[in-house]
Amino acid sequence: MESKEYRKLEYNYKAFLIFSKVAMLTFLTVGIGAIFTPQTYPIMPTIGFIVVAGIVSLIGMTIGALIIHQQYETLPANEKLEFKQKLLPEAYYICIELFGYGSLVLLYNTFTSNNPTLCVMSLLMAGLFILVVLVIWYFGYKSY
């Protein structure tokens, strides 16, 4: 029988996954939109949207992960093991997938845009996303 704490953690975990998907898909939509931005349109609002969407995604996912980790620490040992085996690999896979797609879109922006400012910003964000993927893979997904 699962405890009340475990059910609460599972509920928050699923909400975290939904938030993560929505945040990253929003970021990807803005990034893909930047690809098709006409040359006559001022590029700074597009860059601002990309940066804000990326930062909001990272901050939201970090806060969610910290809340889930705090709740995870209050579980008994048998429920911790069940959570790790049942739910955690899915989160690592989703984060790797979304950040991986994000870095691909940003790299595409880098090499197809005629605007040097967008190229530099896209390259920096792609580098950050690739770093996040490597950290998640090394510390999390690899351990399973």
Curated annotation (Swiss-Prot):
Q: Output the Gene Ontology cellular-component terms.
A: plasma membrane
Q: Which domain of life is it from?
A: Archaea
Q: Where are the transmembrane segments?
A: 16-36, 48-68, 87-107, 120-140
Compartments, record wording: Cell membrane
Keywords assigned by UniProt, alphabetized: Cell membrane, Membrane, Plasmid, Transmembrane, Transmembrane helix
Membrane topology field: Multi-pass membrane protein
Q: What is this protein called?
A: Uncharacterized protein MJECS05
Q: Which organism is it from?
A: Methanocaldococcus jannaschii (strain ATCC 43067 / DSM 2661 / JAL-1 / JCM 10045 / NBRC 100440) (Methanococcus jannaschii)
